[in-house]
C-alpha cells in the first residue's frame, strides 16, 4: 500500500492515529482531540462519505466545541464537501435533519456524559445511522496514511443553518400527537448542555408547569454534578417543588433518566418496561420483543418474561441495539443508561423525545409516574465498579487474565441462575467495568469487591 501525505491537510498520523470507540472518537480536547487531528478526521470523513449533498455539523455546549467544529469544517471543505453548521443542538437532531434535507452525512461534536474537558466526534451516514464499521475503518486507514488519495476536484464551503433546528422541535411536538401536559408540574435538569436548546420550549408548548435546572449552555459546567450522571439535584427539586416527575439529560441529550414524585430513579430499563407494556397492550409490539443490552437488570428480564414477552440482549452501545432492532423488526429497545430507540420515531436515541413520551403517556392515562413505577418490576440489586487499568489491559489484556477469569467463574457458580456477572472494557474511558447483580445484596457486595480487587491487582501489576 502506498503511503503518502495529503498536501492539503498535512502529514498523515501514522500509528498514532486514533480509532473509533463505541460512540465515535473521544479524548481530551486540545491534546488527544486536537484541531490538527480534527482537520484530518474531517477530511477523511469527507472522502469516505459517498452520497452527494452537504455534511451537517452540530455540537453541544463544551467550550472546545467551536474550535473542533472549525477544524472539522476545514477538513470537510478541503475534501470538497459543503458544510451546514447547526450550532448548539441535541445529537438526535443531526440524523433527523440528515434524512430530511438529503445530506451526505453528519457529525456531532460532543463527549456525551463525559467531563467538560473531553470532547468527541459522532459520525452519521446518509441514512442517519452511525457510520458503519467498514467506513470507520476506511477513515482510520486514511488517518494512518495507508491509502492513495488524489484529492477532490473542488473546495467546499460552509454556511450557518441553525434555522433547520425548528424542524427538529416540530418533530418532537408531533411525536406525542394530541396529548398535552396542561398544568402538570415537571422539573427538567438540562445539565448546561444540548438540551438547553430545545427541551424547555417543547415542554412549555405542551402546557407543562415547568421548573428548569441548569438551563443555560455552559461549556465549563456541562455534566458537572448535574444531569443524568448525577441525579441528586433533580431528585431534591422534584420533591421540594411537589412535582409529579422530573427528567435529567446528558450533555448531548440523546439519553434521559427520570425520577418520580418520591425521588425514585426511573432508568432505561423501567422506561422500556413501561413504554413496552403500553405497546404490548395495544398489540403494537411485534413478537412482544424488547431489545436491551447486557447491562439491563435481571429483574427487568424476569418481569418482562412474566408478561409473556421476550428480551433480546446485545453488547453495550446503542448501535448494537439499533442493529438488532432492524434485523428483527423490533419496535422498542434501549439501554439501562437511558438511550431509548423507537422504530416509530426514527430509531435514534433521543432523550427529550423519550421524556415527552413518558410524561404524556402518564398524563394521558391519568396515572402518576410513581404509581406506574410501583406496577413495573423490582430490580435485582446491581453494582457497577470502574477499575482504572492501563490502555493495553483495557483493549485486550484483561480477557486473558486467568486469575480474574477464574474469579468470574466462581462468582457465577455462587449465584447460579439468580445472578449475573459482566466484565467489560469501556469503549471511551481507560477503565474496566465490573458489574454484579443478584437477588442477594450480600452476594453482590461480596463479589463486586472481590472481582474489582482481582482486576486491580493483576491488571495494574508493574
UniProtKB/Swiss-Prot annotation:
Coiled coil: none
Reactions this protein catalyses: alpha-D-glucosamine 1-phosphate = D-glucosamine 6-phosphate
Cofactors (names): Mg(2+)
Cofactor binding note from Swiss-Prot or TrEMBL: Binds 1 Mg(2+) ion per subunit.
Tagged with keyword Transmembrane: no
E.C. no: 5.4.2.10
Main enzyme class: isomerase
Gene3D superfamilies found in the cross-reference section: Alpha-D-Glucose-1,6-Bisphosphate, subunit A, domain 3, Alpha-D-phosphohexomutase, C-terminal domain
Alphabetically ordered keywords of this record: Isomerase, Magnesium, Metal-binding, Phosphoprotein
Post-translational modification: Activated by phosphorylation.
Record's GO cellular component terms: cytosol
Residues bound to Mg(2+): 112, 250, 252, 254
InterPro entries according to UniProt: A-D-PHexomutase_a/b/a-I, A-D-PHexomutase_a/b/a-I/II/III, A-D-PHexomutase_a/b/a-II, A-D-PHexomutase_a/b/a-III, A-D-PHexomutase_C, A-D-PHexomutase_C_sf, A-D-PHexomutase_CS, Alpha-D-phosphohexomutase_SF
CDD domains listed in its UniProt record: GlmM
Modified residues (Phosphoserine): 112
Domain of life: Bacteria
GO MF annotation, one: phosphomannomutase activity
Catalytic residues in the record: 112
Job description of the protein: Catalyzes the conversion of glucosamine-6-phosphate to glucosamine-1-phosphate.
Sequence similarity: Belongs to the phosphohexose mutase family.
Name by which UniProt lists this protein: Phosphoglucosamine mutase
Source organism: Parasynechococcus marenigrum (strain WH8102)
Gene for this chain: glmM
Amino acid at each position: 500500500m502506498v503511503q503518502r501525505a495529503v498536501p492539503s491537510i498535512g502529514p498523515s498520523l501514522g500509528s498514532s492515529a486514533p480509532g473509533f470507540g463505541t460512540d465515535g472518537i473521544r479524548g481530551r480536547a486540545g491534546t488527544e482531540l486536537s484541531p490538527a487531528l480534527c482537520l484530518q478526521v474531517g477530511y477523511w470523513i469527507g472522502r469516505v462519505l459517498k452520497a452527494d449533498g452537504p455534511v451537517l455539523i452540530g455540537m453541544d455546549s463544551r467550550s472546545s466545541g467551536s474550535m473542533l467544529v472549525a477544524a472539522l469544517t476545514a477538513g470537510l471543505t478541503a475534501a470538497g464537501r459543503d458544510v451546514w453548521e447547526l450550532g448548539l443542538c441535541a445529537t438526535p437532531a443531526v440524523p433527523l435533519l440528515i434524512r430530511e434535507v438529503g445530506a451526505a452525512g453528519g457529525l456531532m461534536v460532543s463527549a456525551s456524559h463525559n467531563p467538560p474537558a473531553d470532547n468527541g466526534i459522532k459520525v452519521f451516514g446518509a441514512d442517519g445511522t452511525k457510520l458503519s464499521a467498514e467506513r470507520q475503518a476506511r477513515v482510520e486507514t486514511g488517518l494512518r496514511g495507508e491509502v492513495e488519495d488524489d484529492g477532490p476536484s473542488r473546495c467546499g464551503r460552509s454556511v450557518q443553518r441553525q434555522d433547520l433546528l425548528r424542524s427538529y422541535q416540530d418533530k418532537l411536538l408531533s411525536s406525542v400527537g394530541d396529548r398535552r401536559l396542561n398544568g402538570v408540574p415537571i422539573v427538567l435538569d438540562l445539565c448546561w448542555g444540548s438540551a438547553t436548546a430545545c427541551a424547555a420550549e417543547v415542554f412549555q408548548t405542551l402546557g407543562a408547569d415547568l421548573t428548569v435546572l441548569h438551563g443555560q449552555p455552559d461549556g465549563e459546567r456541562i455534566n458537572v454534578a448535574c444531569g443524568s450522571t448525577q441525579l441528586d439535584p433533580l431528585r431534591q427539586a422534584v420533591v421540594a417543588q411537589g412535582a409529579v416527575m422530573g427528567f435529567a439529560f446528558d450533555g448531548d441529550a440523546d439519553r434521559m433518566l427520570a425520577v418520580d414524585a418520591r425521588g425514585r430513579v426511573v432508568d432505561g430499563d423501567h422506561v422500556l418496561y413501561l413504554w413496552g407494556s403500553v405497546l404490548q397492550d395495544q398489540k403494537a409490539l411485534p413478537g412482544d420483543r424488547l431489545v436491551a443490552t447486557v447491562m439491563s437488570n435481571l429483574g427487568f428480564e424476569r418481569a418482562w418474561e412474566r408478561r409473556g414477552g421476550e428480551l433480546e440482549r446485545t453488547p453495550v452501545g446503542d448501535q448494537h441495539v439499533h442493529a438488532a432492532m432492524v434485523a428483527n423488526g423490533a419496535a422498542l429497545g434501549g439501554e439501562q443508561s437511558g438511550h431509548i430507540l423507537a422504530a416509530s420515531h426514527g430509531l435514534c436515541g433521543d432523550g427529550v423525545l423519550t421524556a415527552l413520551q413518558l410524561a404524556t403517556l402518564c398524563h394521558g392515562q391519568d396515572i402518576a409516574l410513581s404509581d406506574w413505577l410501583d406496577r413495573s418490576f423490582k430490580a435485582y440489586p446491581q453494582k457497577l465498579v470502574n477499575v482504572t487499568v492501563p490502555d493495553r489491559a483495557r483493549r485486550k489484556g484483561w480477557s486473558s487474565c486467568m486469575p480474574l477469569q477464574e474469579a468470574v467463574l466462581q462468582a457465577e457458580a455462587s449465584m447460579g441462575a439468580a445472578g449475573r456477572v459482566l466484565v467489560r472494557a469501556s469503549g471511551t474511558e481507560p477503565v474496566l467495568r465490573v458489574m454484579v447483580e443478584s437477588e442477594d445484596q450480600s452476594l453482590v457486595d461480596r463479589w463486586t469487591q472481590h472481582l474489582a480487587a482481582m482486576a486491580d491487582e493483576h491488571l495494574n501489576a508493574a
